Amino acid sequence: MKKTFTYLSFIIFLGWFPSLFAGEIYVSLQGNDKNPGTKEAPFNTLNRAIKQAREWRRLNRPEVAGGIYIRLEEGVYAQRNSLFLRPEDSGTPDSPTVICAVDGAHPVISGGVAVTGWKRGCNHPAVPEKLRQKIWSVEAPLIGNRRVETRQMWVNGHKIQRAAQFPDGGLERMIDFNPEEQTITIPVSQNVNPKRLQNAGQLEMIVHQRWAIAILRVKSIDVKDGQAVVRFHEPESHLEFAHPWPQPVIGGEKGNSSFCLTNALELLDQPGEWFQEYPSGTIYYYPQADENMETAEVIIPALETLVTIDGTLSRPVKHIQFNGITFEHTSWMRPSYQGHVTLQGGFPLLDAYKLQEPGLPEKAELENQAWITRPETAIRVRGAEHIDFKHCTFRHLSSTGLDYEWAVTASSVEDCQFTDIGGTALLVGAFPDGGFETHIPFIPADVRELCSHITIRNNFISNVTNEDWGCVGIGAGYVRNMDISHNEVCHLNYSGICVGWGWTSLESGMCNNRIEANYVHHFARRLYDAGGLYTLSNQSGSVMRNNRIEHLIEAPYATNDRAFYIYLDEATDGYTMENNWCPAERFDSNRPGKKNVWKNNGPQVADSIKYKAGRINQD
């Protein structure tokens, strides 16, 4: 009798609490999008699974009650267009949509395509006779009716250097930078032989300019008397020579600014270098000694954005979580089409110039103006709430990894790994772009436009900024109530964690941001005017505490020594800096406000604080 009563009670319990049971949708590389999406008969694509979940919600099906779990089986899910999530895909607090791995699987969402059919030997006249049998070539894959064009290639999981002067002996110092003539003069030497590059139609110059780089497509090279005068294509030529900050330095404390020539078949002379000729699409590669091109896995990216989550202020996308997913292989093609000249943090300039008479109503001493755009990103989130990434991996991405771009609230990135990323690992918040001049305080009419209550916690970020050296580990612009804590951020070419934008002392909505217990190390490897922890502008009620910052690298091509463990850049105000450990009190403040408070920062901070910084509960 007791057993019967228990059984009946359980049945009644199920009837009254259907929300305990979630709907499940399965995706497998062996599946079919005509299947019902069950474990036994899964779908083949994530797009189809998302559509199924959307329909369940539209029809208010019983499967929605306890949430929808889209489970991906093992495999690489190649995307040929960005996965698009919209307000109709929203979950609820009691019924989220979770995109996750089946138990024990490690699914990958990829924008890459395999490159196969390599042939040994290259008879191109740009290649010296002695190297022709060492170089392999292949036609790039076709997608649609076009050969894939790329600036990135991975061989057996390792990113390969494009053919460049750089691995042949490091960067070289320029001789002159001439804004009036729009030219850069470089030496002719054993390392730099511009004569043989005069017919290299895809040649680029990487210019080292303080806290940023420029990538300029070379238009012409005129060689005379041991020097070469280089001119560049538009629009980047105008931008490079018109924008005052940052420009290359001539006559710096440590010499002139540096440069590197890259992307020419004539430079393909070292193992581990490659070049793609366009419009033919042919790829040339000089393999390393341990690589067998008949069996090597070679991947090039064919997509810039893997996932787009796009809502509005009135209809945000809500309650979607990614758990245990790897995102990899995205491209970044902007420099190939229009060059790449940035203001700071990897943000490309649309226009910039020096004011003949300084001053704006918002900033009387301002001497320059700049309009920027946003870098490409693997995952873009706009107009959203409760969009969470947990235990995910972001790798082999060519620009930004993940971008909470606009009007995102109550969202988190936790226990994730970001490695081998060309730009910034994580971007958050407004960096006003388009027609909004970037030095004017951004004060939106609706405060919901500001990203708020974003948590970035317990993540590992390493080897990012490896294409655009001026990017950062974590970059936050106009944000409020942000929590950046217990992350390890390392091996960066510029700054580690950067919060703030605008160079303004005025109130703008940035406030109550927390940078706590992070471990930042091995930064400023190539650029300077950097900070392990870096801030800009007025951010009332913000704190920077219990962080550990060390291994500030003396960038070999810097023209001065401006790099710091903590750097409060222009107009930083409203911060309390407390109990931050670093091996020396190497700090700087650039025209700060009056409400900053410094308490016990430097090598004297207790080990009990120092060793608690960084990730916790590491896998």
Where are these regions (language model features)?
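Bacterial N-terminal signal peptides that target proteins for export
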Residues: 1-9
